[in-house]
């Protein structure tokens, strides 16, 4: 955050050479946790936003684009997801979207930073919408790497695993969770028809990091789908990579997606059958040299 003549301006780096300038009307909270600097601010164009180490993680006006695109392609592709694991997602919006599916019996959300969860509960009610208090939710404050290792030792199984972590290039916290070795552990946590999905940053500005994550997923899953969606407050299209042991999200027609959403009573603001098909058919943005 920089103070310049006039308004407060957040200078968010998109790459080492490009930044996005965001006008901030009010700083609601600032805290340095054990892991990162956390801010909750009111912005002019994006509403209330969560910022970690100068990177916007979510904002009120466009978070549905990000969270619905992260959660629902995997959840809808699986015919009956009962047990779901979320790694990251401290603001609670990913948990909120998962719990929209009545098939879910237990959603476990694991975040390393309890301060993010605490501040989100207090300052970001529109994000979590009470999801933290659901009897179907279990919130664990722990390193995801440690949790997954223990879950494997205990024989836990999940139908869907969602990785809603900081970018592989923006923070040291999550880097070990994007390796092929860790993705292999995720695969072993899944039931035989399980699905995992991860956000993978931006393929245009950080192609090497994106390809690292893509290779890690391809090394462990027979079905891999890449897709992306434009997030205005990020200043770029965020990439997602889905790995499946059985079901292919690209095989679902729009009508079937809409039917599954309707049958489950899932209400969305962005994700629909048409959006699903569009996401699965979009090219990946890469630099054209």
From Swiss-Prot:
Enzymatic reactions: S-adenosyl 3-(methylsulfanyl)propylamine + putrescine = S-methyl-5'-thioadenosine + spermidine + H(+)
**Keywords, in A-Z order:** Cytoplasm, Polyamine biosynthesis, Spermidine biosynthesis, Transferase
CDD domains recorded? AdoMet_MTases
Q: Record-annotated residues binding spermidine?
A: 67, 91
Q: Where is the active site?
A: 164 (proton acceptor)
- Residue ranges spanning the membrane: these are none
**In its UniProt entry, what is this protein called?**
Polyamine aminopropyltransferase
- Record organism: Pyrobaculum arsenaticum (strain DSM 13514 / JCM 11321 / PZ6)
Query: Its Enzyme Commission number?
Result: 2.5.1.16
What does the record give as its pathway? Amine and polyamine biosynthesis; spermidine biosynthesis; spermidine from putrescine: step 1/1
Which stretches make up the PABS domain?
5-245
Instruction: Kindly list the biological process annotations in GO that this record carries.
Output: spermidine biosynthetic process
Its subunit composition reads: Homodimer or homotetramer.
Q: Which Pfam families match?
A: Spermine_synt_N, Spermine_synth
Similarity comment: Belongs to the spermidine/spermine synthase family.
**Top enzyme class of this protein?**
transferase
**Keyword tRNA processing applies:** no
Q: Report residues binding S-methyl-5'-thioadenosine.
A: 36, 111, 143-144
SUPFAM superfamilies in the cross-refs: S-adenosyl-L-methionine-dependent methyltransferases (SSF53335)
Q: What does this protein do?
A: Catalyzes the irreversible transfer of a propylamine group from the amino donor S-adenosylmethioninamine (decarboxy-AdoMet) to putrescine (1,4-diaminobutane) to yield spermidine.
Q: Where in the cell is it found?
A: Cytoplasm
Which cellular components does GO assign to this protein?
cytoplasm
GO MF annotations for this entry?
Answer: spermidine synthase activity
